[in-house]
Amino acid sequence: MTAIVDIIGREILDSRGNPTVEVDVALEDGAMGRAAVPSGASTGAHEAVELRDDDQTRYFGKGVRKAVDAINGEIFDAIGGMDAEQQAQIDEILIGLDGTANKSRLGANAILGVSLALARAAADSLDMPLYRYVGGVSARTLPVPMMNIVNGGVHADNPIDFQEFMIMPVGAKTFSEGLRCGSEIFHTLRAELKKAGHNTNVGDEGGFAPNLPSASAALDFIMGAIVKAGYKPGDDVALALDPAASEFFKDGKYVYAGEGKTRSIEEQARYLAKLASDYPIVSIEDGMAEDDFEGWKLLTDLIGKSCQLVGDDLFVTNVTRLADGIGKGLANSILIKVNQIGTLTETLAAVEMAYKAGYTAVMSHRSGETEDSTIADLAVATNCGQIKTGSLSRSDRAAKYNQLLRIEQQLGAQARYGGRAALKALA
């Protein structure tokens, strides 16, 4: 039987040393599932609420005992004894139990931990890998990684205004080959930065955080490292950006503190379009601020047919905001972060809506991560073809890459690599 017999919540630490939630779900047949919840540094205003204790005597107010108490008490009381395979029904109960639009009463961190641990427990009971349990027989596409090798913005203590500069091994034949490519470029970039006198400290997501003056300077270093490592920019390896523009959008303008420049909405869109023409940039995430719909429309009209434009803060994995954006013709892709919405069922619904509208989907980590590798399985389960899970250092990031290597090995000849076709802009 897959009846839920126990749910145990606990407070653990994430990759930034902040508390987060971990949940164990035990079933009657002895099966068990465990999930840990990530957290973000640059968070969208419309995300589901991560419940913190606000007790300044513990972890500077960042403790999650309230969320843990909700898991061990109210949530277990509501779903204990239910069949773990009834994922959608249980997720609906959890949403109703919270009773708020943004999961602020029980906390999205509490609800998500239970939702994901539940899926893992059910998969364990059926002796199935998570990607197969969630995705069925068609789950076999290994994603192209977006490897964040230079960090800026709120992810690093340097002057670079953009948050992430990523490489995508679109020309690789397999995931493992793509991972090797990324690793070789990462180590080459380290050597090149060091040779030029820059520090090689890493940011929250494992990328380097050098004191470079502009986005172009960072892109030039990355282009050089790609060539030096023996790869061809644009053919073997494409570039992707995450400006996280909401972080520097002030009073209707984009304020580049590091560069000492201010750009209007139109200037911001045209600046990004120029970068995309000057470099082999195939994906830009959050190039405009989350509520700058005018800017998003302008950017989409400018380069939406040739570049993947990913909405993260714009959509926050929320079907209501996604439907609104689709209707307005904003972006052409959605970033999928499970903790932005708070249940597995709602996450899968967002992916499905994106696909139906002809949008791509990118499975994503958060800057505050754990060793939990659920998103690797979800990337394969949804066949989304793209994953964003950090750089080639820090074990919290490598955990996801290593899980994808295992999945590729398990799938054997069935495995397919997303490659160039994963991005509609390149297909």
Curated annotation (Swiss-Prot):
Binding of (2R)-2-phosphoglycerate, residues: Q163, K337, R366, S367, K388
Pathway as given in its UniProt record: Carbohydrate degradation; glycolysis; pyruvate from D-glyceraldehyde 3-phosphate: step 4/5
Cofactor note: Binds a second Mg(2+) ion via substrate during catalysis.
GO biological process: glycolytic process
Active site feature: E205, K337
Catalytic EC class: lyase
InterPro entries registered for this protein in UniProt: Enolase (IPR000941), Enolase-like_C_sf (IPR036849), Enolase-like_N (IPR029017), Enolase_C (IPR020810), Enolase_CS (IPR020809), Enolase_N (IPR020811)
Essential cofactor(s): Mg(2+)
PROSITE patterns: ENOLASE
EC numbers: 4.2.1.11
Localization in the cell: Cytoplasm; Secreted; Cell surface
Record keywords, A-Z: Cytoplasm, Glycolysis, Lyase, Magnesium, Metal-binding, Secreted
Pfam family, one: Enolase_C
Binding site for Mg(2+): D242, E285, D312
CDD domains on file: enolase (cd03313)
Family to which the UniProt record says this protein belongs: Belongs to the enolase family.
Protein name per its UniProtKB record: Enolase
Single GO cellular component term: phosphopyruvate hydratase complex
One MF term in the entry's GO annotations: phosphopyruvate hydratase activity
Reaction catalyzed: (2R)-2-phosphoglycerate = phosphoenolpyruvate + H2O
